[in-house]
């Protein structure tokens, strides 16, 4: 039997022993060494050749990833590691660190119970490290720390042992500060990482060695030995004495929870149903014999097998041919194949039980975040939707070069929207022009060149990138009337800014649009009061839609109940296209103050009420001192002091604001923010300005008001582009 076949056999037998399973992710800032680390773990576990590890980047198996040298998608793999005399099954997900692909990280967090946070010893904590840690802790995923690229501190920066220790202490303190700040209440103080207990390891993923205090005690290697090996440039021998996979996977097994332990506190966090019900108990206890329930965390397109769903099972088991229910879209599907991931390959297995991550084919309708369960299980509500911290801020229009490719292009776009819920796709079959909104230039480029051009073979024309703006109100409008086309129905609205606490809670995912479908009015009211809304107003909330709220302030209007859905529909249409530039509104509170309806239902149908509400709400917003908001990016630049002036000049030319500066040695770190609209082509420009000597990264920083002097011009440009009147 080949080594690989033996590995598959081990994986299958270990799937049933829950205390020997670990579902883990590796997450970090871009280029801090996640994929190199993953490769060496695989090599240690016998999955790929040791000589190739680190160069092979087995989990970057997409051509686009290999070419760019970065991880774009989250890759999955299962492997076996011997620890404390017992074999353990480790399901590993390697996630991207580039800010444009953060959506993949968010979805991967739903599938795992523990995370190895990788921090580069040279750069320290970076913005994306903080973002991925926040996502992990929000999903109650326990972190451990690996400080990578330690050899560079010795060989390049020539730090003394004392400076080395100080650098490590600073990184550990910074990580713990973030963990303490963002941990769920019950884990404050318990989840901090600690050198002495072995929840921190140091090493070099590229040179394949690592060390932790427990491993030092076991092997009698000292820190002085490590310094000597690095300075003598003999890291190969060090890798034999302290192999990366042994140190790291021991740390994973010792410090990260198995699925039975993790699901006890993770299920109440992601599922708001009755935990005492049969399905509730089965999920909390990770029961393989209970009803089947799981969540699709990722959709992968395969040329031969079609859509493959990566699924984390919380209870029950899935066999080939099982019928499944897709809860959110109320559809049925059949699991045509059940497999485990081995990097780019999938290996078929007879069945997969609770607590594991598997690959399913046959779930054509499923999208990332979908809840799956057995057909006779009532899993209500479905799992909490997977919320992501950033928003799509750049849009491009695309058209097929050949009209015969149009149907194919529409299929591909629908598939992309299912695979990646951070992409917004608007399909216009009449004009043939379709809009894709993504997280940044690179995100859009990968979608248009790779997913549409390379994978689907559709040639497309891509328009100039357009920035996504928002509209918001800064004052309170008078009472504004909306009349139906037949003049028999009148509704009166007031628009004003939404309370900041409510808007922030919506951004953080504490209240969601779908709460109004899933929860009782009383539950919604309690939740709104908890986050700081006035109880009188909380009672009267009709709906929340994309960060805007509609309240019913009327009393005793008989026909209002039957008109309710139409009023909500009209409100949604109005805030989807604001009055200034037909951009989405955000942070607007609209109050329905009064309404007069025709007593005959035939005269107050959808064709009458929706336009009445739409014009009334839009006019109220227009009279509440409406202004434009633009998306902002936080920009972090680390540059040698000689080039600091050039880097700052490049930022100020792009309406950038310097927020903070820190100096360490001859390197300066600049923290700043700049509008997305000014950041096109920044990558090339900043490399030119600093002769390629700087490191830089960006992350989404929310929306801010457009400067008053620039607003008229921007509004005019948007309206012209959309074919609206500009006078």
From Swiss-Prot:
Keywords: Cytoplasm, Elongation factor, GTP-binding, Nucleotide-binding, Protein biosynthesis
Tagged with keyword Nucleotide-binding: yes
GO cellular component: cytosol; ribonucleoprotein complex
PROSITE patterns given in the database record: G_TR_1 (PS00301), G_TR_2 (PS51722)
Transmembrane segment boundaries: none
Modified sites of kind Diphthamide: 603
Residues binding GTP: 28-35, 94-98, 148-151
A Pfam family per the record: EFG_IV
Subcellular location: Cytoplasm
Covalent S-S links between cysteines: none
MF annotations from Gene Ontology: GTP binding; GTPase activity; translation elongation factor activity
Primary localization: cytoplasm
CDD domains the UniProt entry points to: aeEF2_snRNP_like_IV, EF2, EF2_II, EF2_snRNP_III, EFG_mtEFG_C
Domain tr-type G, residue spans: 19-260
NCBIfam families: aEF-2, small_GTP
Function statement: Catalyzes the GTP-dependent ribosomal translocation step during translation elongation. During this step, the ribosome changes from the pre-translocational (PRE) to the post-translocational (POST) state as the newly formed A-site-bound peptidyl-tRNA and P-site-bound deacylated tRNA move to the P and E sites, respectively. Catalyzes the coordinated movement of the two tRNA molecules, the mRNA and conformational changes in the ribosome.
Family: Belongs to the TRAFAC class translation factor GTPase superfamily. Classic translation factor GTPase family. EF-G/EF-2 subfamily.
UniProt name for this protein: Elongation factor 2
